[in-house]
Amino acid sequence: MDTDANIGSGTVCGWSATGNTTFSQRNITVGVMKIQEALCPRSLEQYWMQSQLTAGSQYDGVPFEQAFSEQKALRIAEALETAIWQGNSYFSGVNQLLNAASGSTVLANASSTTWNPVSASVGITTSNVISIFDKVYNDIPQAILTKTDLVIFCGWNNFRTLIGALKSQTGVMYNQVDLQGLADGDIIYPGTNVRIVAVPGLTSTNRIVATYLGNLFYGTDLLSDEENFELWYSKDNDEVRFQAAFKAGVQFAYPDLMVDFRLA
């Protein structure tokens, strides 16, 4: 939804509509996914985990349930994080959606009178990373500059390169950048109102994406679905079974309010 605020004269009586509201729609393609795994407790007899197995040769429990569940939840979260940005077989990620919307998205690495595109052969380095982030920031549409949830997303590799450049080329690093934010991968870009957030899903892609959080949408059934799973011993099959089922998809509302940097 978008609406304007055209101010009209209030000196006369009567009704004279000056406002206009428009509605549009973008669809979220939600992928229906599941993860299933079968484990044989007998295979643990050759490892230290045998000490956690039930005495004897008949196993009817899940001795490693907590450790396995914690590790599996971590791996599911990592896989979903990558899918949100890069997509998978079941839904398109942000990068793929940006590729499809290139005609209306602000392309930060496009050639202009003031910018020479950075090629893949050159890459993002300590020599050019500050100018790249400056370009992304300067390309953010004026319509959203005053929003309090502006974010520039990048991969951890580019975040590390940026921090290295700030340390070596300017003294601003120690004066304006929050040290805890460095550890968390979440800082305010010096001299701006924009956060820079490092996300694993963009690591090694050399894509940098800027918009406001209210422009990004994550579609699912239940937010906790990927954390709710079953782990049980199947006596019929003489094995431990794991299953997780969830739905997920992403979309953005206004492509023209997205800044997309990709190497030329």
Where are these regions (language model features)?
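Assembly/oligomerization interface modules of large self-assembling protein complexes
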Residues: 1-47
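Intrinsically disordered, low-complexity linker/loop segments enriched in Gly/Pro
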Residues: 38-48, 52-85
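Sequence/fold signature of self-assembling virion shell proteins
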Residues: 59, 95-131, 160-264
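Generic, well-ordered alpha-helical scaffold segments in large soluble proteins
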Residues: 75, 79, 136-139, 162-165
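Short, glycine/acidic-rich hinge or "gate" loops at secondary-structure transitions
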Residues: 81-97
